[in-house]
Structure formats: C-alpha cells, structure tokens
C-alpha cells in the first residue's frame, strides 16, 4: 500500500526497494498492479432488481412499469416537468436540437473543444456548427466569445460540462435569453452536479443525460432529455412516436438505473471528497492543474477528472507519454477529446477566430477515469504517489521510451 509522498515526492515509509521507486514503464513495480478498478461496480441493489425483473418475465415487455418510474424519478430529482428517455446521450442531443426547432441552414454555437457527437448531431439536422473558443483557465465554453459568433441564422447554443468542469452556465443562459437563442445543456458527464443551487441539466431550455457504459449512471446505453417546457416535450414526442417509439430505453435498462439514481448524490459526495484529497496530495506539482475543484457554489460530478498538463514542468515528458506511464502504474489517465476544428473539414463548420484555447485543450487535456474516486483513501494516495514517481523520473522516461499517442476520445 502506498503512503502519502513527502514534499520531495518520496514515500513516508522506510522501504528502500529500488524497483518500487523505478517507474513501471521502465521495468519497475507498478504502484497499483491490479490496475484501474472496473465499472460499473458490483452492486447488490442492481443484482436484486435484475433478479426480480427476470423472475417476473417483465424484462421483455414493450411498455412496463420501470420506464415511466424512471422518468418520474428523474423529473423529481431534477425538479423538471418533462423527462423523455431514449437510447443514448447522443440521441438525446439530437432530440434536444429537434425539440428547440433547429432546422436546415440554422447555426448552432458550441465549444471548439467538445464531444464530437455534438458537432455531428448539428450536421445530422443539416444545420451549421459554429465553433466558439473555450476559457483559457477552465477549457469550458467561454461565454465571452459567444457574441462574436452570433448571426441572424443562429438558433441555439450547446453548453457541455466536461471532465468534472462546469460551464459558467448562468452567464450562458443570460446571453441566450438576451439574444433569443435556445440553450441545450449537456450534462452527460455531470449528472447530479449542483451549480449555484441548481442541478446541472436544468439551466437550459433542454438538458441531456447519458447512461452509456462508463457513465456515472449506466445501463450500457441510454439517455434522457429534460425540459420544463411542454412545447419542446410535445415536439420531441411527435418526432419519436411513429406507431412505436423510435429511440426507446428498455425495461431492463430502466430497472438497472433506478437504484443508481437513488445513490447518485451519495456517490458524487464521495467522489468530491476523493478529489479534494488528491488535490492536497498533488500539491506542489506544477504542470498538472485540476480543471475544477468543489467550491461553495459548484459541486461537480466527476465522470472524469480533468487536468491541464504542461510537459515543460515534467522535463519535456509529453502528455501522451505521461498517460502511458501512469497507465503502467495502474492509474487510468487518458488524453481528452480532440479539438473539433482539428478533426473536421473547415467546409463543415464556421469559426470566428483561430480557436487557440481549444487547440491547447486538444494538446494538454488529461483525464482521470472516475471509478477509483469511490475507492479508499489509500487508493487516492497511491495515485498521488504514482504521479510523483513518474515526475521524478520524467527525464529518464523521455530518454528511454519512444513517445506514442494515447487515443483521444477514450470512453472506457
């Protein structure tokens, strides 16, 4: 078991095993030889729901009791009137765009650094993505850059809370209202987060959730659309109801999600405690800065914990080789998303500037996968020790290991 590093990055114990101090990528002993924890967790409440559902035979029904129960539970949890369940978070964003009335040749503003499916959903409606740069400190959508992007064709804004960070959603909402734009709040990575006393996903005309395999609420696949507006809900219903539901969530998926919603707040609180501990343990490590820590006004939900990485503070160790080195130690670090302007033809979008900060996010974003944040204090201390361990040997890693790319957009 690792102990908390001293200020010089060494363990606070008397062990002198050189193999333990040598990075695993160079042949040393891994800090966490069992590797990162899996997801979803082995949860008896989920097992019990599945046993009851299978025993009853209701798991195969088109219209059972669990789907409407989940809709009601999510509506109460988010204090919204309408919740429409669907087959994925990506589908939820598409339905949100359709619900607010986005049409061909309309423009939709979104961050230049965002999940690529949001960009592709805009194209799916034959609308035009307009990329806006991100904030230089948080790498979230920058509301100060919205005004320059608006034209007479602008219809909506997609604001995504990414990697445990949060968009300044109050300011984005005020901008949208002032300009008569629909606001779609993507809370797929931040379910249950609180921002200025309100749940993430409830600040816009529409909010979206994802129940994908690695998400904090998971059914393997699935999503939800949240809205306080009856007109938007009815427009979406007219689109999806075609004699049967075109984007359904199954009874089994809904049943699995019900106990997870009940424990989401408790698990999010545990994740925040773990993040605060990790931030204390990594104190003094320049070049690895958390995107968001809990504050009085913001209680994030850490699907992934994002960091700004600066290789110059790690003896030139690249972001991707750092992630490989931590992976070798059994810690699930990955690169973030790709900048949307870097992976799509310029003919497919409009941008008002060079998206410099989105490019920096593309090159410097690191994410820690969330399952370990529900483990013990000792596990968090092991992560901190692994970071110190790699940093101490960064120059040797650079000289001995060929650099290689860690694929962006990793969805574990």
Question: Can you name each region flagged by the protein language model?
Answer:
Residues 1-91, 95, 99, 177, ...:
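Conserved PLP-binding active-site segment in aminotransferase class I/II-type PLP enzymes
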Residues 84, 109, 130, 183-184, ...:
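Structural detector of well-ordered beta-strand residues that form the stable sheet scaffold
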Residues 202-235, 247, 251-256:
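Active-site PLP attachment segment
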């Amino acid at each position: 078991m690792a102990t908390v590093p001293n200020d010089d990055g060494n363990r606070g114990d008397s062990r002198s095993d050189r193999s333990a101090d040598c990075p695993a990528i160079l042949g040393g002993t891994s800090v966490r030889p069992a590797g990162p924890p899996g997801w979803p967790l082995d949860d008896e409440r989920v097992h019990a729901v599945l046993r009851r559902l299978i025993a009853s035979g209701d798991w195969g029904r088109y219209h059972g009791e669990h789907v409407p129960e989940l809709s009601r539970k999510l509506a109460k949890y988010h204090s919204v009137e309408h919740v429409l369940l669907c087959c994925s978070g990506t589908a939820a964003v598409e339905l949100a765009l359709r619900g607010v009335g986005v049409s061909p040749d309309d423009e939709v503003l979104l961050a230049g650094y965002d999940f690529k499916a949001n960009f592709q959903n805009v194209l799916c409606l034959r609308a035009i993505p307009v990329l806006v740069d991100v904030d230089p400190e948080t790498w979230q959508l920058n509301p100060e850059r919205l005004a320059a992007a608006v034209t007479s064709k602008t219809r909506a804004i997609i604001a995504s809370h990414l990697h445990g960070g949060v968009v300044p959603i109050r300011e984005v909402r005020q901008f949208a209202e002032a300009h008569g734009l629909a606001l779609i709040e993507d809370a797929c990575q931040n379910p249950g987060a609180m921002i200025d006393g309100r749940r993430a996903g409830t600040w816009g005309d529409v909010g979206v959730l994802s129940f994908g395999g690695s998400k904090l609420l998971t059914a393997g696949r699935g999503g939800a659309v949240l809205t306080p507006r009856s007109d938007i809900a009815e427009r979406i219903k007219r689109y999806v109801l075609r004699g049967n539901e075109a984007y359904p969530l199954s009874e089994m998926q809904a049943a699995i999600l019900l106990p997870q919603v009940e424990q989401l707040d408790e698990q999010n609180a545990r994740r925040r405690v773990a993040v605060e501990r990790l931030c204390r343990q990594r104190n003094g490590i320049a070049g690895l800065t958390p995107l968001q820590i809990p504050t009085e006004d913001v209680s994030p939900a850490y699907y992934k914990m994002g960091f700004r990485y600066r290789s110059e503070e790690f003896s030139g160790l690249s972001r991707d080789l750092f992630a490989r080195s931590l992976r070798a130690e059994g810690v699930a670090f990955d690169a973030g998303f790709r900048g949307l302007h870097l992976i799509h033809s310029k003919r497919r979008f409009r941008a008002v500037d060079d998206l410099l900060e989105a490019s920096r996010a593309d090159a410097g974003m690191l994410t820690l996968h969330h399952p370990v944040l529900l483990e013990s204090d000792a596990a968090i201390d092991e992560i901190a020790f692994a970071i110190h361990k790699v940093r101490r040997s960064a120059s040797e890693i650079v000289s001995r290991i060929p650099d290689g790319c860690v694929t962006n957009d990793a969805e574990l």
